[in-house]
């Protein structure tokens, strides 16, 4: 949990907007945590009203070009409004490290941020693999020195919310991870 709390504290002071990119269990669990913790209008609240936590959007759960274009316009607007200090965190989650929808959405988002000179950093959440035979996503993370979190071997998508797949989102919006785990353990 220490690394997750460090991520939480870092994001509260350095990140304006998080875009969580995933599909299936890599999306749904995080989206439920966000909805439970934040509600529908979180992104409309001021930084103070969000207790310093960043805005959060989701992408990669489909191949809808209009949705992605709208998200990019939103990020561009926010960057123009805040100025050069605006910073985005892309959280790309893929168990296999190569799922088409999130990887394609991630590449489009990254290119859009680069083209618009918007500051960003990347966090990768992917299957545990050794550095000798990494998933495509883990190889990208190693090459680019991104923060990484792991999906344990054998954990299916619907249960991944109880791993760093869900916990990264939870940390980034101030969700009580320890309480969540205690509740799950009591069932």
Regions inferred by a protein language model and the residue ranges of each:
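Extended, charged alpha/beta regions that create polyanion-binding interfaces
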Residues: 1-9
């Amino acid at each position: 949990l220490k690394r997750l709390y460090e991520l939480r504290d870092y994001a509260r002071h350095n990140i304006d907007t998080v875009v969580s990119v995933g599909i299936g269990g890599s999306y749904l669990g995080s989206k439920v945590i966000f909805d439970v913790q934040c509600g529908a209008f979180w992104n409309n609240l001021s930084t103070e009203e969000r207790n310093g936590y960043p805005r959060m959007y989701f992408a990669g759960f489909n191949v809808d070009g209009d949705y992605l274009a709208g998200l990019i316009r939103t990020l561009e607007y926010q960057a123009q409004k805040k100025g050069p200090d605006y910073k985005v965190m892309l959280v790309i989650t893929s168990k296999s490290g190569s799922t088409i929808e999130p990887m394609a959405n991630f590449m489009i988002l990254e290119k859009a941020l680069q083209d618009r000179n918007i500051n960003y950093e990347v966090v990768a959440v992917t299957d545990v693999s050794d550095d000798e035979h990494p998933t495509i996503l883990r190889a990208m993370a190693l090459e680019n020195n991104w923060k990484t979190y792991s999906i344990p071997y054998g954990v299916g998508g619907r249960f991944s919310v109880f791993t760093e797949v869900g916990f990264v989102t939870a940390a980034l919006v101030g969700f009580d991870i320890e309480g969540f785990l205690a509740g799950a353990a009591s069932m």
